[in-house]
């Protein structure tokens, strides 16, 4: 029985955990890549989300839900805590734009938010350091047990690790150990695994204070 349809882009880290959860729970979810260039799919998406935002989910019963955080919790059917929401919100609103601001220009793509490269680099380093310090004290983001917050945050860090794996390892050991552990979880690895190593150097100018 169909669970519903997920409109997304290919790729987009904001949908990685959603798709992995659907597979974990054996949910029959139709995946539609609704970029603007796919005119028919994009027009279909806009019938449910006039802004054309992804991810957007349309249930078999017509229930419509968008935004990656509520969608992830909905697919997981997990009783959320405020701390899980805290880390998911941080990853989505702070970490992901910061990583994108550094990663995307270095592979020839447009930044998520237009800002100075130095500001982008400082923001990414500060947020990675924040996570690294937290993970020195805690095995996972929310205590000693893995939660959906870990999978969600790890998926939004893929760009940073794909581009700057060696530099991330040198500077943020606890963060790297956590990230590698999360990506080794079987059901998640089936969807999120195979992150390429682009081997880019993360050069930090002396005037960048973080």
Curated annotation (Swiss-Prot):
Pathway: Secondary metabolite biosynthesis. GO terms for cellular component: cytoplasm; nucleus. Disruption phenotype: Impairs the production of monodictyphenone. but still enables the production of intermediates untill emodin. Its EC number is 2.5.1.-. Residues 2-83 form the GST N-terminal domain. It comes from the Eukaryota. InterPro entries: EF-GSTs, Glutathione-S-Trfase_C-like, Glutathione-S-Trfase_C_sf, Glutathione_S-Trfase_N, GST_C, Thioredoxin-like_sf. It is an enzyme of class 2 (transferase). GO terms for molecular function: transferase activity. Residues 77-200 form the GST C-terminal domain. Keywords: Transferase. Belongs to the GST superfamily. Glutathione S-transferase; part of the gene cluster that mediates the biosynthesis of monodictyphenone, a prenyl xanthone derivative. The pathway begins with the synthesis of atrochrysone thioester by the polyketide synthase (PKS) mdpG. The atrochrysone carboxyl ACP thioesterase mdpF then breaks the thioester bond and releases the atrochrysone carboxylic acid from mdpG. The atrochrysone carboxylic acid is then converted to atrochrysone which is further transformed into emodin anthrone. This is Glutathione S-transferase mdpJ. It comes from Emericella nidulans (strain FGSC A4 / ATCC 38163 / CBS 112.46 / NRRL 194 / M139) (Aspergillus nidulans). The gene is mdpJ.
């Amino acid at each position: 029985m169909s669970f519903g349809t997920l409109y997304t882009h290919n790729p987009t880290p904001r949908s990685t955990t959603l798709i992995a959860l659907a597979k974990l729970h054996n949910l029959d979810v139709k995946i539609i890549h609704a970029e603007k260039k796919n005119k028919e799919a994009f027009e279909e998406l806009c019938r449910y989300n006039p802004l054309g935002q992804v991810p957007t989910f349309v249930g078999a019963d017509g229930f419509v839900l968008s935004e990656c955080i509520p969608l992830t919790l909905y697919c997981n059917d997990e009783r959320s805590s405020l701390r899980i929401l805290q880390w998911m919100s941080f990853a989505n609103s702070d970490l992901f734009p910061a990583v994108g601001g550094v990663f995307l220009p270095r592979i020839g793509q447009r930044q998520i938010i237009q800002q100075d490269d130095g500001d982008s680099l400082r923001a990414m380093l500060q947020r990675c350091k924040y996570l690294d310090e937290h993970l020195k004290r805690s095995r996972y983001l929310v205590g000693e047990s893995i939660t959906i917050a870990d999978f969600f945050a790890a998926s939004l860090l893929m760009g940073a690790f794909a581009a700057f794996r060696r530099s991330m390892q040198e500077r943020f050991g606890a963060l790297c150990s956590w990230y590698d552990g999360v990506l080794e979880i079987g059901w998640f690895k089936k969807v999120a695994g195979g992150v390429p190593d682009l081997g880019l150097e993360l050069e930090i100018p002396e005037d960048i204070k973080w």
